Every structure is written in C-alpha cells, then in structure tokens.
Amino acid sequence: MSTAAPAASATNSAIPAQKEFSLPPSTDTVSVPVNRKKQKRRQKQAARLAAERQSNGHISPDAATQNGSSPAADPEGYHSDEFGDVDQEQLSNGDANHKDDQDSVDAHDDYQYPGNGSEGLQKPTGRKSKKKKGKKGPNGTHAPEDETATHASTPSVSMSHPLPPTLPSHLGPRPILKPAKTRSIWNTSTQEERENIKTFWLELGEEERRQLVKVEKDAVLKKMKEQQRHSCSCTVCGRKRTAIEEELEVLYDAYYEELEQYANHNQGSFEKGPPIVPPPRLYQPPLRSPGQHTRTQGQFHPSRGRIHEVPEEEDDDDLEEDYDEDEEDDEPYSDEDSDDEDDEARAARADFFAFGNSLTVKDGILTVADDLLKNDGKHFIDMMEQLAERRMQREEDTQYGIAAAHQSLHSGHNHGPFDEEDYDEEEDEDYDSQEDEDYEEDEMDTMTEEQRMEEGRRMFQIFAARMFEQRVLTAYREKVAEQRQQKLIEELLEEETRNEQRNAKKAREAQKRKDKKKLQKQAKEEERARREAEKAAEEAAAKAEQEKKLEEQRKKREEQRKKKEADRKAQEEERARKEAEKLRRQREERERQAEVERKQREEKKRREEARRKEKEERELREKKAKEEQLQKDAAKAEEAAKEREKREYQAKRTSPFSSNQHPQISSSPVAHSPHIQSGIPVVPKAPTPARPRQPSQQDSHTSSPHSQPASTDPSQASVSPRSMPISQSSGASSVASKHVHGLHAMFHQPQPSAPLSPLGRSIPPGFSAMNGLPPGPPGLTGILGRPPMAHELPVYPPHSGPFIGQFRGYPTPNGIPAAPGINGARAMPPGRGFPLESAHGFPFHGQQQIPGAFSAQQSGLPHGHSRQPSGSFERSPLEGQTQPMPISRPSPIKRPSSTQQDQRKNGDRTAQRDVDDLSAHLGSSALLDDTDVPFASTLSQSLPGATAPGPLPGPARASFGGPSLFPDPLSTSGWSNNAFGSGVHHRAHTSRPVAIRLLVIQACKQLNTMSPFKGADGFHDVSLVLRQVEQLRPQNEPSISLKEMLDICDTEGSTQNGGGSFSTKKDETGEFVKFEPDNNSAASGHRGSIVPGEIGSPVPSSSLPAFGGIGTPSVLRQFSSPPMGF
C-alpha cells in the first residue's frame, strides 16, 4: 500500500473521536450472522439510552430513528475530557502509556465529564458498578442545538419533526480565556489549558475548521501500515501481517469508494449489504440528561471471557495502540487520560454512531460533513467524544478476549511473554483461533463479507477521528507557540526599551556630572590662574631684585678685573725689564767670553811656540839619557823579574785573600782627546806629596775652582799614556823610574796623584795572574795574559752567584764586585773563538784592566752635584768606564795639555774656563731670574740611591787597551764603552701612552736633525714618523699603530710625558705632524736635550735593558725607575 499524503495532513491529525457501526439494523431484522456478544451489548446500550431519553422527556426512540437527528453534545465536556487530559499529559508529566487496557476498563467505569456544572447520574449496575463515583446535580433537558447534524448523511431523515429544545444557558458556550492582562501564556494549569483548547476551536472559522479535519487517503493508509513496524518478524507473524495489510488495502479502497459514492449521491449502499448509514435503532436512544453519567462499555461478558472478534477489529486495536505509541512523544493520546479525571461526570453526551455518515471523500481527501463544522463546531466536538467512548469500550472487549486466550498464546510459537498493555497480531491470531475452537459448532460462519466491510469502515472511522483530533491539538499548540514567541518578542522589546531608557538616564546623569566637574575645573583653573599671576608678580619683583644684585656684583668684578689688569701690566713691564737686563748681561757675557777666547788663542800661540822650542831641547837631552837608561833598565828588569817570580810563587803558596786594604786611586774625569797623540817625553820627577782632597771638593754645591788651587797645580797633572812615546829608545832609566813610581804610587796613600804607567804596571802582591796564566815577559808586566779561547773556561763562569757582589773591591764576572783580595779577573763572554784586535798596529790585546780598582769614589753612587770633580789625575786609558757627567756646552778645540809646561801656561785659562763651566753647570735657583726655568734634574740627581751599572764589559776592540768608539755587539755588559757615559739600567715603569709619546718626540727631533733643507717647517709625514718610532721602539714592546700614535699626539704635554705639544695638518698629499717643545719638554734638560747626531751627543748605547730587548733610549732614561735588584 502506497502513501502519498502531504506532510501537513499527516502531522496535523488532531481530532479525538471514535465511531463504530453496528451491523444489525434492528432487533427485529437479523439477516446476517453477527457477533452475539457485541450484538447483545449494543442492544442493551441502545435500550438503556432510549429509556434514559424517555425518562428525561426527550423524543422517543422511534422519532429519533425516523428523523435520524444527531443530538448535540456538550462542547465543554469534550474539551475537559479528551483535549485537556492530552494536554495535561504532555505539559505535566509527558506520560503516554496508554496501552494499559485493563486500567482503561477500570477507569472507564468511573469516568466522568466535569466542567458543565451538573451532577452525573449513576449508570446501570454492572460488574464494576461499585467503582462508580458521581455527583448529583439539577435535572434539566439536553436538547441538540443543531438538529440538522445528519441531514445530509442520513437517508431516513424527516424534516417535518420539530427541532429539539435548545441547551440551557448554563450549558451554552462560555468564554474560557482570561483577559490578556490577567492570564499568562507561560505557566498554565491543566484546567486553563483545556479551556484554552476549547476556546481555540470555537474561535476558528468554518474554512479553518474544514482545513484542519481534512485527511488524505494516503495519510490514513500510511498511518495504519506504520503500526505494523514493531510487530514480530517471524515467519508466522510475517505471513499474518502480510495478509492483514492486504486485507486492509482492500477494505480501505472499498471504504473510500463507498464514501465517494455517498458524497456524490448523498446516499449509498453496498451491493450486497446494508447501506452505509447504520440502522435507525442506533439513533433511537434519546440524549442523556446533563447530569447523567453513562457507562459506554458492555455490561455483560461471556462466562469464560471468550469473545469472538473479527480479525479486522483486532487488527484495528493493534494499529490503534501502535499509533498511540508513535505519537507518544509529540502528541500523546492515552487511554489513561480518563484515569486522572475527577468524579465530576459530564452530562449531555449523545450516542454518535452516525459519525460514518458525516465522513465524505472529495477528490481523494477524507473530511467531515459540513453540518458538523457549522454552528461553531459543537456537533463535531460532541461526536468526537462519543467516538472516544466507543473506542475504550471496544478495547475493554478485546482485553477480556485476550485474557481468556492467554493460556495457549505461545503453544506453537517461540515468542517471549507480552505485557498486558502490548498486543500484536500473534495474540489476535491465537485469540481468534481459540475463539474459533470454542465456538466451532455454532459460530463457524458468523462473519460475512458485509460484516467485515462494516468493521473495516469502523476501523477507518476511528483512525480518521484520531487524526482529526491530533490536527486540532497541533494547530492549537502552534498558535500557543506563536503567541508565546510574540509575547517573548514583546518582552524583549520592552526590556530593550527599559534598557535604553535606563542608559539614557545614566547618560543624562553622567552629562550632569560632567558639566558639574567642568564647572569645578573651570573654577579651579581660574583660581590657579590667579595664584599664578600673583606668583609671577612676586617672581618679577624677586627677579628685579636679583638683577640689581647681579649688576652690583658685575660692577665689582669689573673693578677687580681692571685692577688685576693693571697689576698684570705692571708685572709684564717688570718682566720685560728683567728680560732686557738679562739679555744685556748675556750680551756682556758673550763679549767677555769672546775677549777671553781671543786672549786664549794668543796665549795658545805663545805656548805652542815655547813648547816647540822646549821639545827640541828635550829630545836632545833624552836621546842622550836613553842609551844609559836602557842598560840600567835591562839589569833592573831582570832583577825585578826574578824577585817578582819569587814573590808570586810565595803568594801562590799563601792565601790569595789578603786582608790589606789597598788604597784606591781616584781618577780625574777630565776629558781627553780621542786622537792618538804623538809621544812627548816627560822628565821624571820625584813624586811630591799631594794635599789630601777635602770632602767639600766633591760634595759641596757652592764650591768653585778658585777654592781648589791644587787642582790646577802642574805638578799634579797626570800623564796620559796616549801622549807617551811608545818607542823603546827612551832609555832604561825612564822605564825604571816609571816602574818605581808606579809601585810607590800604589802603596803610598798620601800621594794619590802619582801616575800609574800602563806599561810598567805589575800585578799587586797577593794577586795571581789573570786567568791563571803566568805574567808577561820582563818589561811588559802590565800586559796580562791572553784571554781564554773558545775551548777554555774562564776563571768565573758566566752568571755566577751574586753573593760575592755585595762586597766592595774588584768586580767579579758579570759585574758583581768581589771582596778585597779576590782575583778580579773577568771572564770573556763564552763562545768567542777569535782573538781580539788592536788598534793602530799596537801589539796589545784589548783585555781591559779593572776600572777604578782604587777609585776614591764608589762608582754608581750619585754625585753631590753634576759638576766635574776637580782632580789632578786623568782617567786611566785602560778603564772601560768614565764617570757619568752631564753634557755641557762643547769646549773649543785645542791641543791636549800633555806636558807640564803646557799645563803651567794654561793654568790661568783653565781657571777662567772653570768659572765659565761653573756658571753653566752650577748655581742656585735663587740666583736665576723669575722668567728662567730651572733645568730638569738628571737621573742620578732625581732618583736617590741609584746603584752602579751592570756587569763590566768583556773584551772589546780598542787601541792600546782603551775603550772603543763602538762596542762589541757580542758584549752583554751594561757598562758603556763610549766616552759619554754609561747606559744605566733602569726598569721602565712608565705607561704605554707616555712611552709612545716620548718615542714620538724623539722621532720628531731626529727627523728635524735629518731634514734635507733648512727651510723645513718642522712638519713630517705621519708614516715617516711612525717608521722612525718603530725603529726606536724596544723589541719586547708591541707594535704601534698609526691611529694609536695620532691619538697620543692629541694628549696634552706635561713633565711626565715629555711636555710640548703636537700640531697636525692635512692636505692633498697626506697628513703631517710637528712637535713644538715648551718649558716642560725634555729639551729644557741638559741630558735629554741632546739628540743623537748633534754636537756633543753620546754614541747610542749598546747595553741591553734589565729584562731583555734593545737598550733603552737616552730620553726614556730620564723617566725610568731605578733597578729593583743588586
């Protein structure tokens, strides 16, 4: 069976009603066999209703049968019962368990219809009459309002009968809805919901009602077939269900054809059966009184509980129950609705078995006759209530039948037990089969085709009524939902309006507060402006007072400045006067010096002339004396050699350490000529005792050459060995005298001025020969043995222990002085495998004697002043060290004073020159002018406790054993071999920036000296200066970058970093730098002002620094610290 009904019609089936037709037309005519039980029950019910109608004054059953009028039902009762209960079930608990047929039977016994204000009358007594409850009310007639309810569908309608009386006023329709202001759509009670449903139906128009009760054919058939989904699917049940569906289709099609014929011809009948309208007897019982409570179910049941039912009716029960289960969630329609009702019975309920007459089919749509929809639809509502009662009565009959057949329910089937409230096709089949067995003899052919068609029509009528009921309820609830939605929207709009009003109020209040704050702020601004104006006035007054004070102070400062300016001008004038006086003195001094030099030159010419004459005479005398002296000297030499060998032999046997303290011979630091002079014979004289020197001659700063007449005595002048003749033709006498003088001078303490000849000098007693070698040949006692060669070991190995260096006396190897009496021989630097060279063909090796062995002044100690000590002895040519002295103005070139006559002649000049030297070297700072800047002190003056230099030099190339101009590069000695002082060892403690600045200053000075032309402005290329600085930089120092040098040039000069300032300039050729000295620069000192290459500058030192590297430059020595050891 196909279903093609619209969805709206399928879902809006909402009309509760049931209708069943009874086939027997009357008790008189029994044409076909029927179900006797149902027939008896229906007959009894019809008789009861007819009696009730007659007792209440209604029309007779015959009249009712003739006209077939449909009495009106109470619309309140319908809504109070069916719709109200359904809605209560949905809204309150949602319980849709409407399958309990037994409960439905019990509940139906005491079912009452409240809401009409009448008491229900008790039903006739029956099996369950004791459960009935009812209320008695006033009696009254209940006449149908519309007697034409079945005019169009009943063929035996008589239009001549009068209309039944109208309903009383208390039974008429009354408004149930409360006023809109008092009622609520959100929370409604059950009674209010029932009233609202009833009012909703009454408010609908005729067209709207017609649209609600329209049901499509396919929708009804679809609903019927859907009831079979939950039944058993076994073979037996499947076959049974298939047969039932086929029969349902046949019945449905036949029913629809009959309805269509009836709609077209206003009447119709089956070809072989009774007409579609039920027999008139069903309409004979009059309507009950309003207060009567009718029991619609049959009062009698078979003694064994077996009821013979046709399969269609049983299948209708199952379909009806299943349909209720499907609609359980959405639109529950339960038989238990009657269980929840109170005892108030509904009055005036008609027996609407003529519902089938009102069903029509138009264009395939099942609908209700128009007369049921007119007159506010009251007839339709009453008819639906009556159909519902018929449905419950039929369910009760089915319940008893199933209970009787329950014993053999599962005899040939494997199904589980079924609940009392659930029945399917198998139960009906078993029930039917058992009924067939029980009534096999007399009821085998009770069901005819007409009966089956009648039952089918009744089943379809029930379905249609229920679908109508559902549609009405659904439409009501849609309306309620729409009302609630609209109410919600209105409430939301009201809430939004209230919020907007509240926000507007808040905005107004905020604006008021803002305006108030603005006024307060404006008042505060005015107050602040007033205070600021007062404060500005006070500040202006204070400022005026302050300006007045500042003006006074400015005037005072101006006066002070003018006063200071006048004082400065006076000082400048005084300084200019002193400068002019100074220049005048200097000019006079230069004139006087020029006069003295002129006189000296004249004196020199006279002295040279006299010396030449004296020389000629002396040569003649010496020539004669030499021959005699040679013979004597040879004999004395042999004699002396034997005695010396004897003494040496004895000295070797005794201890070499002698406790005798040898007198030290002081040497004079008078400069000598570096050139080899021709030998001039000196007449030997007896040594005269010399006056001992006073300590003031060395330590006093205020002494002058005039206070030392002995220093200029010609008898105390030392004889330089370079001025002596080397030839052996001078005679033995002179040699012998020299030897005697040498020995006598060594041990004669009061006569330190006796010269020691380097040729006749012998080893003192108690001292062994140098390096353990025997002394030289006779006549050459002063010549030491050869130095050790490369394969020989020196007397003291290099780097010997420093413990003996604490004693005074002869220095040991590496410059450490040893105790008196210890052999002072010094070892030669190891690894030197070649002999020393001599200068100018002299057959003497360069082994140096011990310098200053008998010196009166300990070398290395600082002098009291930088002036040259006045001594009568010249320094020995064999000494490797000269006394450190400051470099002064170079003296005029003159002949060396090698003879006593020259010294005697030049005595006055020497005294005058000493005065000049004193003025250049000495003098107190108090005698200087205010503008004079005192000389920077030298190292020996500024650093107290300066010690002696390092070790004595080793063998070096020299002429006549003297120091050479350029020392041996292999020498590790710290003693300088030049004639301009020694390279003093001082560990540099200056910082790197200061050292770099000093190197840059020295490089600039050297570049100034080496300038190729006179017109140089003093600017030098920075790359050239950097190259020169790199040459001067010690090797153990890191390299200097150009940027670092330029950064150092930007520093300000001071006494620590060399003073002066640097000027830089840039052009297209490059960048140039220039050094400009000032009073703090090294140029103001007498030692630091000498740049290598200038006149009087010393030869660069070859000594090594204390901790390695190349010798420290002379400029850096001024700012170095004393050594930390020795």
Swiss-Prot record:
Cellular compartments per GO CC: cytoplasm
Region (Disordered): 1-192, 266-348, 404-453, 492-774, 823-914, 939-965, 1075-1126
Main subcellular location: cytoplasm
InterPro entries on file: Fungal_stress_NST1, NST1
Keywords linked to the UniProt accession: Coiled coil, Cytoplasm, Stress response
Domain of life: Eukaryota
UniProt feature, compositional bias: Acidic residues: 311-344, 419-448
Pfam families: NST1
Coiled-coil zones: 479-655
Membership in a protein family: Belongs to the NST1 family.
Purpose of the protein: May act as a negative regulator of salt tolerance.
Protein name: Stress response protein nst1
The species this protein was found in: Aspergillus clavatus (strain ATCC 1007 / CBS 513.65 / DSM 816 / NCTC 3887 / NRRL 1 / QM 1276 / 107)
Origin organism lineage: Eukaryota, Fungi, Dikarya, Ascomycota, Pezizomycotina
